[in-house]
Amino acid sequence: MDRYGETQDPRVTDSIPRAAVDQILQAAAALDSSDGKATFDDVRQLLRQRSSRRAPASREAMWTVARDALSDLQKLRYATIGVLPRKRSEVERLRATPCELTESGRALARLFAEKQGRARAFDELLVAWMNEHRYFRLFNRRLLLGPLYVPDVTTVKQVGSPAQASPLAERVIATCSTRLAIVGYPEAKREIFAAAVRERVAYVEAQSSLSDPDPKKWIDIIENLVVIPAFLATENLPFDAVTFQQLIRVSQDFLSASWTSSYPGFEGRVIFATCDFRPAVVNESDRVEQVVHHGKRYATTGFKQALRGGHQQLAGSQGGYVDAYALRALGCVQLSIPPAVFAHCLDEMIRAGPASGMVIYTELPFTPPPPGEAYVEIGNRRIGLIKVAAANGG
């Protein structure tokens, strides 16, 4: 049994669908619109029509998304699905594969179709994922224990060039361990991480060359085949780098977790929970029944103090303007709230003015947000700098 109360059986794996959460719900809606029954190709075509991406109008477009969405509905007992294509060459033969919603699947689809029910449909699916997708459960339970500080390697500057004589493993360990130590990552876990890095570098070097002259390709290999696998092994998370990234994306879709690369003092990603589950999942047999999101009401109590404390931490004794992305990162991680909730709470304090006990000044951004993050926006106005001052001695 691992530290999260789960039985670690190396034979037990999980398949995380490569479809977005809303696409899974759209697949259910497509089936429900035809009296609960349709074919694989019917669902594929509907998903292509509703896609915001420009998928080509071919007879195979988005077949993997349709397959993964339908497979997940079956896994969660929302549908009964026939044989689905595992590779492109099977798509034509299996177009007419029958798909039928169960009663619970039809109820989910109808909830999703209601304007006021969409959020509840997402939450119902989130609860089902927590109970049925082992990797998703492990990932979110780990976040409930505290944020994950991921020491990503994204530039040659962090580890030096391939031509350097010093051992690559030691360079990776040096840059990652230094950053992890800054955020208080336990020494014992840093030692486990270092051992895992050495093992991964040795394995990759035995399989292929790590002296590729293309810097981007070289860094991608180090990040995806060395750093992330070593970090996941240290955290006792039994999935690969691709699944890890998919779990982050799906958790954002569900509003169960978020991430930032703007956290001050740490060069890397910080991934953190943005909800709780009821009852609390203590061991493998516990089943989740309800999700409690960390919304505006949840954040209101501690937001003022978190904003003031974050500003003081960043501005120091000068008390001037600070980077809005860094301030948002501090507030979101401390309060375990999504960026959108941070923006809502900030907007309310700005509107309240001196009555809130502080005055908040803002300036437009001089730089775009880090890759993967959105602007800090209040209404239609983007904010890049923030200054917090006491009002009337408050």
PLM regions and their residue ranges:
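Short amphipathic alpha-helical elements of helix-turn-helix/winged-helix folds
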Residues: 23-34, 306-314, 330
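C-terminal engagement modules used by replication, chromatin/transcription, nuclear envelope/ESCRT
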Residues: 263-285, 352-394
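Donor-sugar nucleotide-binding helix/loop cap in glycosyltransferases
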Residues: 1-300
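Short glycine-rich, basic-tinged beta-strand/loop micro-motifs
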Residues: 315-337
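An N-terminal amphipathic alpha-helical segment
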Residues: 298-322
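Short, hydrophobic/π-rich interface segment
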Residues: 330-366
